């Protein structure tokens, strides 16, 4: 069977086994993608009216969020057989599924990092506990295939890839603006992707994540990462850059964000404000997300500062970037592609290399199906952004998943939690979240 025949076969199977979602909601509710609103046109007018542009810097007040819920979760999709070229062909065959083209363009512009294979080997841990920390499939692969070290992260790297995607899109927004779409400033895009090449020379490579995870987070190579370990790796790797353009604030063991601590990172010693990524690690229930948090979680993706959610799927991790009513749109890292090479000259990256980091294929998951353990991210670019974000956090309908206070009690030796913090949100530790977020 030729490669072309195999591609057609994969798309044929995918069409029936893993269908792409269509915009079949009856309420005509808008779609939100990282703080941008895409209205849904009436079907009778779609042939005569083009899609409305996204509303810049505008998001719904919490009180106006849709309250109607679908009674039956829509079909979710797990795994895929698509290739980057196959994705484009499948898109053409299925038209746009009723989705606004402006939303699809925005979705496709997001950097999508997935499992990779045939990259320089990541050495195995010599710790006797390392083998037992792996899943059975990864353990067998390490003994039968990757005997000289891990040359693929298939089966264990999904949370790392979700975290990489989150960080890459934060850098994309910071460097190129929220309005960037594919086909513009391609060299700048290549520079960002080169930071995530599957090579130890790349500062945000999977090799660097695994290295820091082993040295500081108790994670062995081949072991699943959770949101907490991923957040700590993002912070450490960003801080290790000589001229870091982005600083990182993590909430640690709770969902409380403290202004004094945040400002000490964003503008230490009262220096100029440096754009700062806020990473909130939380667990919003035991097995499923508790309904009192639904509106707040949906609202988090409507804020202009949002750069998405990593995690949130039982037995796997995804990167969520959009929401419509109670359906969340995500990029799925569970597709193994050839390693993204490291290039000294970014102009040497091929179109195929770049295309492998984008997709126009939508995936959708109802909030009822999401795992409660996750990493919620926001990019704060200046002090005005901070003030606007802090104000928006207070306007959330229902129980909030993020709380902002002026000062960190620990800074004054008080060592106490904010009153009611434990009752409001159940947070995670690595021992808990890694049993939920497999690869």
From Swiss-Prot:
The keyword Protein transport applies. It holds the Pfam family Peptidase_C54. It catalyses: [protein]-C-terminal L-amino acid-glycyl-phosphatidylethanolamide + H2O = [protein]-C-terminal L-amino acid-glycine + a 1,2-diacyl-sn-glycero-3-phosphoethanolamine. Keywords: Autophagy, Cytoplasm, Hydrolase, Nucleus, Protease, Protein transport, Thiol protease, Transport. Its main location: cytoplasm. One of its GO terms (molecular function) is protein-phosphatidylethanolamide deconjugating activity. It is found in: Cytoplasm; Nucleus; Preautophagosomal structure. GO terms for cellular component: cytosol; mitochondrion; nucleus; phagophore assembly site. Residues 64-75 have a biased composition (Polar residues). Its EC number is 3.4.22.-. The keyword Disulfide bond does not apply. GO terms for biological process: aggrephagy; autophagosome assembly; mitophagy; piecemeal microautophagy of the nucleus; protein processing; protein targeting to membrane; protein transport. Residues 76-87 have a biased composition (Low complexity). Residues 48-92 are annotated as: Disordered. The active site is at residues 158, 332, 334. PANTHER family: CYSTEINE PROTEASE, CYSTEINE PROTEASE ATG4. Cysteine protease that plays a key role in cytoplasm to vacuole transport (Cvt) and autophagy by mediating both proteolytic activation and delipidation of ATG8. Required for selective autophagic degradation of the nucleus (nucleophagy) as well as for mitophagy which contributes to regulate mitochondrial quantity and quality by eliminating the mitochondria to a basal level to fulfill cellular energy requirements and preventing excess ROS production. The protease activity is required for proteolytic activation of ATG8: cleaves the C-terminal amino acid of ATG8 to reveal a C-terminal glycine. Belongs to the peptidase C54 family. This is Probable cysteine protease atg4. It comes from Botryotinia fuckeliana (strain B05.10) (Noble rot fungus).
């Amino acid at each position: 069977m030729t490669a072309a025949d195999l591609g057609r076969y994969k798309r044929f199977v995918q069409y029936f086994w893993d269908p792409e979602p269509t915009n079949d909601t009856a309420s005509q509710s808008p779609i939100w993608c990282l703080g941008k609103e895409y209205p849904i046109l009436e079907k009778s007018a779609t042939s005569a009216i083009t899609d409305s542009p996204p509303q810049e810097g505008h998001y719904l007040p919490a009180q106006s969020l849709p309250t109607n819920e679908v009674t039956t979760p829509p079909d979710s999709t797990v795994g895929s057989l698509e290739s980057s070229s196959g994705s484009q062909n499948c898109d053409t065959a299925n038209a746009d599924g009723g989705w606004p083209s402006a939303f699809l363009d925005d979705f496709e512009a997001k950097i999508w990092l997935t499992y990779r294979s045939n990259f320089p080997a990541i050495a195995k841990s010599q710790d006797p506990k390392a083998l037992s920390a792996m899943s059975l499939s990864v353990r067998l692969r390490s003994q039968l295939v990757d005997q000289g070290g891990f040359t693929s992260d298939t089966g264990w790297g999904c949370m790392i890839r979700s975290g990489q995607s989150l960080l890459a899109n934060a850098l994309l927004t910071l460097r190129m603006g929220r309005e960037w779409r594919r086909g513009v400033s391609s060299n700048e895009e290549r520079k960002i992707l080169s930071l995530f090449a599957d090579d130890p020379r790349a500062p945000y490579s999977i090799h660097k994540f695994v290295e820091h995870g082993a040295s500081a987070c108790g994670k062995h190579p081949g072991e699943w990462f959770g949101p907490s370990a991923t957040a700590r790796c993002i912070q450490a790797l960003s801080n290790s850059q000589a001229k870091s353009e982005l600083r990182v604030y993590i909430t640690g063991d709770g969902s409380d964000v403290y202004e004094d601590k945040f400002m000490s990172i964003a503008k230490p010693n009262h220096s100029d404000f440096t754009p700062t990524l806020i990473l909130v690690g939380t667990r919003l229930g035991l097995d499923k997300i508790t309904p009192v948090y639904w509106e707040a979680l949906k609202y988090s993706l409507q804020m202009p500062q949002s750069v998405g959610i990593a995690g949130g799927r039982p037995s796997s991790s995804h990167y969520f970037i959009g929401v419509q009513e109670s359906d969340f749109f995500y990029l799925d890292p569970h597709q193994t592609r050839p390693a993204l090479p490291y290039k000294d000259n970014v102009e040497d990256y091929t179109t195929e290399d770049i295309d492998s980091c984008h997709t126009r294929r939508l995936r959708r998951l109802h909030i009822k199906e999401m795992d409660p353990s996750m990493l919620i991210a926001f990019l704060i670019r200046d002090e005005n952004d901070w003030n606007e974000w802090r104000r928006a956090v207070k306007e959330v309908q229902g129980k909030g998943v993020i709380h902002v206070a002026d000062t960190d009690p620990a800074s004054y030796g008080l060592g106490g939690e904010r009153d009611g913090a434990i009752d409001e949100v159940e947070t995670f530790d690595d021992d808990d979240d890694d049993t939920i977020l497999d690869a």
